[in-house]
A protein has these predicted regions:
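Collagenous Gly-X-Y triple-helix signature in extracellular proteins
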Residues: 1-192
Length: 192
């Protein structure tokens, strides 16, 4: 018989920042590791390492924020992620709610989508995962043809890791940045 326990330890932002600057962040943190953060509004969140890049680790929220936010004010996916209200909200409002030390360490990411034959590009510090990053390439051509050139993030290879909760509501659905291939009014999402 085995017993499995979670180990929690204190870490300072400057320790993480130094590891990132030295190119040793992946020696300190691995995919699946979680960091508890407090927004400047007081909301407490957990970010989780979900994948790796040449710059280090990719962190996304483990669960949903307390308040919901739509992809756009109207029911449309025109312009894809680049033109979405969600993108503007994350990179114009939420980015400034993050702890200063965390915000300074975020490396912007270039996001490219092909929507109706048009190449749409943006560079973002905060972003939602695509259908392909969440579920892999299987089904992406039908569900989310804008993002088929991407690969699945390591953490999301199991269904359990894709489930999120919303404070006070239990398991909850959440948005992906991929325009839904079958509907001009929707973006893809993960159901609970």
């Amino acid at each position: 018989m085995n017993i499995r326990k979670t180990i929690t330890s204190e870490i300072e932002w400057n320790t993480i920042k130094k590891a990132q600057a030295d190119g040793k962040l992946q020696e300190l943190l691995q995919v699946g590791d979680e960091l508890d953060i407090t927004l400047k509004t007081g909301e407490e969140l957990t970010v989780q390492a979900v994948g790796t890049t040449e710059h280090g680790l990719i962190f996304l929220l483990k669960d949903c924020m307390k308040d919901e936010h739509g992809m756009n004010k109207r029911m449309t996916n025109k312009g894809g992620w680049r033109d979405s209200e969600m993108r503007l909200w994350l990179n114009g409002t939420i980015i400034h709610m993050l702890p200063d030390e965390l915000r300074e360490m975020i490396v912007p990411r270039r996001i490219v989508q092909t929507v109706d034959g048009e190449r749409l590009e943006s560079e973002d510090k905060l972003w939602l995962p695509s259908f392909t990053e969440m579920f892999g390439k299987e089904g992406a051509e039908d569900w989310a043809p804008a993002d088929t050139d991407e690969t699945q993030l390591e953490l999301f290879r199991t269904e359990r890791s894709r489930v999120k909760e919303r404070p006070g509501n239990g398991t909850w659905w959440h948005w992906l940045r991929s325009p839904c291939g079958s509907f001009s009014t929707r973006f893809c999402f993960v159901g609970s």
